[in-house]
UniProtKB/Swiss-Prot annotation:
It holds the Pfam family BMT. GO terms for cellular component: membrane. Beta-mannosyltransferase involved in cell wall biosynthesis. Required for beta-1,2-mannose transfer on phospholipomannan. Its EC number is 2.4.1.-. Keywords: Cell wall biogenesis/degradation, Glycoprotein, Glycosyltransferase, Membrane, Signal-anchor, Transferase, Transmembrane, Transmembrane helix. Residues 34-612 are extracellular. Belongs to the BMT family. Its main location: membrane. The chain crosses the membrane at residues 13-33. GO terms for biological process: cell wall organization; glycosphingolipid biosynthetic process. This is Beta-mannosyltransferase 5. Induction: Expression is induced in biofilm. The gene is BMT5. InterPro entries: BMT1.
């Protein structure tokens, strides 16, 4: 084999020395990129990022490569250039229990006993501990300025709905027209970060009930809930045995139907996104969001006339699923195959799928489906093949929808076959599977606890009751704790709580107005994580983080502990297979109405004392 020889002949010894110095600096700088994780523990890495706002690239903890090869892989596989000070590491962060102060909290649960004509609302106390509320709203001025400066294809597509953004940035009037709300997050164990999605809405008038468009904003937080301002995750590229990168924070391009010429009575974009983890066929967990959005009727009309505003096509508010680490070309599956949007066919959007009721029924508006997975299915198959939804809490109705295949959803369970009536109790968070949580741990004494769940699956969630004109404002929303049990092929909404507020300070709907002017809202959005840990007495304790929003203008979290221990009694886990009624809901709503009236009375009394 002939070896090529390269001769280096510098014009001067000074040039030679200088070039050697530069080469040494480059080598040292590049080496430092991947040595950070070897020399610092995860907390110190996080502290370095916070101090210097550096770019950080995180590989999953199971990535098959040595630490000192990560930077090379990043450059060779993705062509990404690294700068001096950038941090590249393979995750070894574990979940950090919240370091906070807790106070006791009690709510009342109701179960399904008696008949509707002879309603018995027996209260069962549920005791647990709560922290104060923590706000996680982003700097809207900064993120919108960055979005505008990026000038991506997605920004160009949606910015026609907010042409005054530049003026609003210059005049510092962003807070009058833009709001961030409905944050929902998951803990990515392989990456050691909390991944949160929220809505950023624009309203031309400044009125939150008259939004023009809703954008989806994704952020990553470290295990201590400090935002990572410039983070890239190396994630699997599904089905290709390869990897790709995703960077946060960012507005993600979820494909939606919209028409700038038809805005009257329309609210475009992604509404109420809820994020959760599903286990895919490749065997790893990936984030999935469920949301609702306008969708146009099947393409059977004159598109050109629609653009010219000569015809008005039927639109529907449909439920969608979106795989935020997967992509699709174009947006034809959301009813946007219009001539003026032809260029979108070449753009990569987040992969989405519309969900349809059995028999292709298509109501005008679909909202508030409550998602969950059946853990027994996952154990048998090795992955989640379907996502299930509580379609209606009253007259309990549950849908089964394929995660990976086409086709309509089917009814998995219906309390009765009558037309489902949507009650005041509606979807809030996803349902968290208690069996799945317990199976992750093998603490001493936990087997006795697991025995209580043999032959049944149990889920908990925080729904929300929407009460109109109950005494305080036009509408009041608060969380309602629920327990769902599946046993012998039958589902039962075993327990529902009255309104609960966690002692959180409520914000007025409009600045300068009273708490009972307009809407009075505290909405549960998602269960961010739920873990077990050993306690000092040799037993265990459970810790949960819940995301909330107040007055449709905040992204908040609150920590709780002891919920699982409180429901771990034979009494609370029993199901009466002969009882099929809505009594738990009826009792919870009656008590919630009493809460609303008492809240209004106390607020007015407080105002009177303050005025005097």
């Amino acid at each position: 084999m002939v070896q090529k020889q390269y001769r280096f002949a510098p014009k001067s010894i000074f040039t030679f020395v200088f070039l050697c110095f530069v080469a040494i600096v480059v080598i040292i700088s590049t080496s430092s990129l991947v040595q950070v994780e070897e020399s610092l523990d995860p907390i110190e890495v996080s502290d370095e990022i916070k101090k210097h706002d550096r770019k950080v690239v995180i590989f999953p903890s199971n990535f098959q490569s040595a630490n000192n090869k990560l930077a090379d892989f990043l450059t060779e596989a993705f062509g990404q250039r690294l700068n001096k000070g950038d941090i590249v590491y393979k995750n070894r962060d574990t979940y950090e229990l919240p370091q906070t102060v807790y106070t006791w909290n009690t709510i009342d649960l109701f179960q399904s006993i008696g008949e509707k004509d002879n309603l018995k609302c027996e209260k069962i106390p549920l005791n647990f501990e709560i922290s104060k509320i923590y706000n996680k709203n982003a700097d809207l001025y900064k993120i919108l300025r960055d979005f505008k400066n990026e000038n991506s294809f997605y920004y160009k597509e949606v910015s026609v709905f907010f042409p005054d953004l530049g003026k609003q940035l210059r005049e510092r009037t962003i807070e009058k027209h833009w709001f961030q709300l409905i944050g929902s997050s998951v803990w990515l164990e392989q990456y050691g970060v909390h991944l949160m999605i929220s809505r950023v809405i624009y309203t031309k008038t400044g009125n939150k009930v008259q939004p023009v468009i809703s954008l989806s904003y994704v952020q990553a937080f470290d295990r201590n809930w400090t935002e990572l301002k410039n983070v890239t995750l190396v994630v699997p590229d599904s089905g290709k045995a390869k990897f790709k990168t995703v960077s946060y924070p960012s507005f993600i391009p979820i494909p939606v139907y919209h028409n700038v010429n038809q805005q009257r009575g329309k609210f475009y974009g992604v509404e109420d996104p809820r994020i959760m983890l599903v286990k895919n066929k490749e065997g790893y967990e990936e984030p999935l969001i469920v949301y609702n959005s306008f969708n146009r009727s099947p393409p059977n009309a004159n598109y050109l006339e629609e653009i010219k505003n000569l015809v008005k096509l039927d639109t529907y508010r449909s439920i969608f699923m979106a795989w935020i680490w997967r992509t699709q070309l174009g947006k034809s599956n959301v009813g946007s195959s219009l001539p003026d949007l032809a260029t979108t066919d070449d753009h990569k959007y987040v992969k989405v799928k519309e969900l349809s009721l059995p028999n292709k029924k298509r109501p005008k508006t679909e909202k508030n489906w409550t998602p969950f997975v059946i853990y027994e299915d996952q154990k048998k198959q090795g992955y989640d093949s379907h996502l299930y939804f509580i379609y209606s809490f009253q007259d309990l109705s549950i849908l089964k929808c394929s995660l990976w295949d086409a086709g309509n959803c089917i009814w998995e369970y219906r309390m009765n076959n009558k037309k489902t009536k949507i009650s005041e109790l509606r979807g809030g968070t996803e349902l968290m599977n208690v069996n799945q949580l317990l199976d992750k741990y093998n603490f001493a004494g936990l087997e006795t606890v697991k025995d209580q769940f043999k032959g049944k699956e149990v889920w908990i969630s925080f729904a929300r009751a929407a009460l109109s004109k109950c005494g305080c404002g036009s509408k009041m929303y608060r969380p309602n704790f629920t327990v769902l049990v599946k046993q012998g092929g039958r589902f039962q909404l075993s327990f529902v709580s009255s309104y609960m507020d966690f002692g959180v300070p409520i914000l007025p709907w409009a600045k300068g107005k009273g708490l009972c002017n307009g809407k009075n809202l505290l909405i549960p959005n998602g269960i961010s994580n739920w873990v077990l840990a050993k306690d000092e007495g040799g037993g265990f304790q459970d810790y949960m983080t819940l995301s909330l929003s107040r007055s449709d203008s905040t992204v908040d979290i609150i920590h709780m502990k002891g919920i699982l221990k409180s429901i771990l009694s034979e009494y609370l886990l029993q199901t009466n297979r002969d009882v099929l009624n809505n009594n738990a809901i009826h009792c919870a709503l009656l008590e919630s109405e009493s809460y609303c009236k008492s809240y209004a009375e106390n607020y007015r009394a407080h105002l009177k004392r303050w005025q005097n």
